[in-house]
Amino acid sequence: MSTFAFLLLCVQACLIQNVYGQCLGRGLGGCGCGGGLGGYGLGYGLGGYGGGYGYGGYGGGYYGGYGGEGVGNVGVAGVLPVGGVTAVGGRVPIIGGVEFGGPACAGGCVSICGHCAPTCGCGYGGLYY
């Protein structure tokens, strides 16, 4: 096999790995809401949202990868009323510091689930919400 053919084979293997890595996301494993069953649409337990098993009703929990990048410097001061339902599916990578200060008044059903490193989630100390 020539060097060029071997290099082409390696590039194709990397592309296939990239495609399947984005389509499948995280399956079983880790901890979080639902005992690590987020990959099967059971992210918030058997009750879930919408009467099904998790966010998407009875669909599978396979979401595409994030795939984007950018600088997201966001500063909010004052009163910020938020009404309605907000759902984020998939992975939201955060590199840098995330800080929240002040009281957070919430009414209704509020669920916050996820992983933050290294101070909370997965047995790394208390969860402060």
From Swiss-Prot:
Region Left arm, annotated ranges: 22-64
Protein's UniProt keywords contain Repeat: yes
InterPro entries: Chorion (IPR002635)
Signal peptide: 1-21
A single GO cellular-component term on record: egg chorion
Region (Right arm): 113-129
Any GO MF annotation of the entry: structural constituent of egg chorion
Region span, Central domain: 65-112
One Pfam family this sequence matches: Chorion_1
Function field: This protein is one of many from the eggshell of the silk moth.
Family per similarity comment: Belongs to the chorion protein family.
Name of the molecule in the record: Chorion class A protein L11
Lineage: Eukaryota, Metazoa, Ecdysozoa, Arthropoda, Hexapoda
